[in-house]
Amino acid sequence: MYLLIPAAGIGKRMGSNRNKLLLKVRSQPIIAWTLLAAEAANTISWIGIISQPTDWPDFRAILADLKLTKPVELIQGGSTRQESVYNGLQALPLAAEQVLIHDGARCLATPDLFNSCAQAIRHCPGLIAGVPVKDTIKVVDEQGIIQETPDRQKLWAAQTPQGFDVKLLKQCHAEGVRQGWEVTDDAALFEKCGIEVRIVEGEETNLKVTTPQDLAIAEFILTTRGV
């Protein structure tokens, strides 16, 4: 299975002006934990890191330190996540029929989750990892007045990995460019094109490290794992 990791974000909410994936959690950069999980997943055979060239020296140093056995390619990112994934799709080896896309900041995803998604995508056009929502969700207007309370039984919090048929995802990205769609994940492109996307049970610990509080939680979870 081929894995693309969007990794071009700046850690503004971390109070940092550099790529947040270079920040350390328990002595390793955030991106290193993501890469180690992908390395340990027996279904993953190739990894593409989509990032800005200014970060490549740092990423190369991390890769040299990790000594991964799987091929890793650095791919130039775009100005948005959507553009970055599009660039990543163009850089996939020709043999790639399915692809997993995983946020580099979700550094707590386990090898088992990568394997589950890699196996499931062979039987459907698209999927995302996700977990059922526990909190009651409110829809509010611009004035902060509650308009609606959706049925919690139908709500899932989207995570990554997300998996797709490569040919279909390329078509959806091309349609997104033509239509001027702006989306926050690739599943939304499939939805707009009317293509089925399934849910694979994710992991409660698979949080996206975005704030200093997330960083502290990630430290705690990694400590409990004994790594």
Swiss-Prot record:
One of its GO terms (molecular function) is 2-C-methyl-D-erythritol 4-phosphate cytidylyltransferase activity. Pathway: Isoprenoid biosynthesis; isopentenyl diphosphate biosynthesis via DXP pathway; isopentenyl diphosphate from 1-deoxy-D-xylulose 5-phosphate: step 2/6. CDD domains: CDP-ME_synthetase. It is an enzyme of class 2 (transferase). Transmembrane segments: none annotated. Keywords: Isoprene biosynthesis, Nucleotidyltransferase, Transferase. It holds the Pfam family IspD. The record marks R152, K208 as: Positions MEP for the nucleophilic attack. It catalyses: 2-C-methyl-D-erythritol 4-phosphate + CTP + H(+) = 4-CDP-2-C-methyl-D-erythritol + diphosphate. It comes from the Bacteria. InterPro entries: IspD, IspD/TarI, IspD/TarI_cytidylyltransf_bact, ISPD_synthase_CS, Nucleotide-diphossugar_trans. The keyword Cell membrane does not apply. Its EC number is 2.7.7.60. The record marks R13, K20 as: Transition state stabilizer. GO terms for biological process: isopentenyl diphosphate biosynthetic process, methylerythritol 4-phosphate pathway. HAMAP family: IspD (MF_00108). PANTHER family: 2-C-METHYL-D-ERYTHRITOL 4-PHOSPHATE CYTIDYLYLTRANSFERASE, CHLOROPLASTIC. Belongs to the IspD/TarI cytidylyltransferase family. IspD subfamily. Catalyzes the formation of 4-diphosphocytidyl-2-C-methyl-D-erythritol from CTP and 2-C-methyl-D-erythritol 4-phosphate (MEP). This is 2-C-methyl-D-erythritol 4-phosphate cytidylyltransferase. It comes from Nostoc punctiforme (strain ATCC 29133 / PCC 73102). The gene is ispD.
